[in-house]
């Protein structure tokens, strides 16, 4: 039986640029492991960053900019949208009401440096 989500992997063109975007501009916790791979931590889950030039054979069809995911925040999404715009991040949509895994959420959508669609949502 499937019990939850452990991690996702993003194939990226420039790991340093991606780490800077998520860590410095969005506040994600970032760390490098012993193999030199970067991880973004989100509570009990994580996002692994994999340079597209060094993808393992099992992930050879993974392309930068094709992911679409939602992370949760406790921050007011109207304030978040304003903060993103002030940081030079183009807000594509939102705040807008959606249905999340556990109920109503208010979401803000934007792209990361590789073009992945990032949704940050706050439960209503």
Predicted regions and their residues:
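N-terminal beta-strand motif that seeds the catalytic metal site of vicinal oxygen chelate
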Residues: 1-17, 67-69, 123-124
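Loop/turn position at the start of each blade in beta-propeller repeats
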Residues: 3, 35, 103-105
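Core segments of cupin and vicinal oxygen chelate
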Residues: 11-53
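Short, conserved charged micro-motifs
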Residues: 17-18, 76-81
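Short beta-strand micro-motifs in enzyme catalytic cores
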Residues: 38, 67, 104-108
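Short, charge-rich, low-complexity interaction segments located
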Residues: 54-60
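Vicinal oxygen chelate
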Residues: 82-124
């Amino acid at each position: 039986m499937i019990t939850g989500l452990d991690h996702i992997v993003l194939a990226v063109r420039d790991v340093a640029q991606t780490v800077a975007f998520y860590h410095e501009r969005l506040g994600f916790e970032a760390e490098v492991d012993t193999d030199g791979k970067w991880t973004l931590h989100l509570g009990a889950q994580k996002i692994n960053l994999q340079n597209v030039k060094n993808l393992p054979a099992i992930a050879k069809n993974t392309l930068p900019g094709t992911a679409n995911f939602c992370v949760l925040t406790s921050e007011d999404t109207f304030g978040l949208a304003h903060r993103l715009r002030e940081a030079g991040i183009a807000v594509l949509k939102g705040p807008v009401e959606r249905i999340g895994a556990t109920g109503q959420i208010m979401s803000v959508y934007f792209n990361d440096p590789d073009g992945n669609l990032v949704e940050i949502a706050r439960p209503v």
